[in-house]
Amino acid sequence: KSCCRNTWARNCYNVCRLPGTISREICAKKCDCKIISGTTCPSDYPK
């Protein structure tokens, strides 16, 4: 699951992932998001 700081970061992550060629980790790093193993995002990454 990916968690982002705000809507801008979430949109950035979604667009980054669209082609299906860029890994979740790279998109998360680039867009200020985190990949988590659980189901609940931390409060500082609510999106």
UniProtKB/Swiss-Prot annotation:
Keyword hit for Disulfide bond: yes
Protein role: Thionins are small plant proteins which are toxic to animal cells. They seem to exert their toxic effect at the level of the cell membrane. Their precise function is not known.
Disulfide bonds: C3-C41, C4-C33, C12-C31, C16-C27
Transmembrane segments: none
SUPFAM superfamilies: Crambin-like
Protein name, as recorded: Thionin
Annotated compartments: Secreted
PANTHER family to which the protein is assigned, alphabetical: THIONIN-2.1-RELATED (PTHR33920:SF2)
Family: Belongs to the plant thionin (TC 1.C.44) family. 4 C-C subfamily.
Gene Ontology terms for molecular function: toxin activity
Entries under Gene3D superfamilies matching the protein: Thionin-like (3.30.1350.10)
InterPro entries: Thionin, Thionin-like_sf
GO BP term, pick one: defense response
Principal place of residence: secreted
One Gene Ontology CC term in the entry: extracellular region
Provenance organism: Pyrularia pubera
Keyword terms of this UniProt record: Disulfide bond, Plant defense, Secreted, Toxin
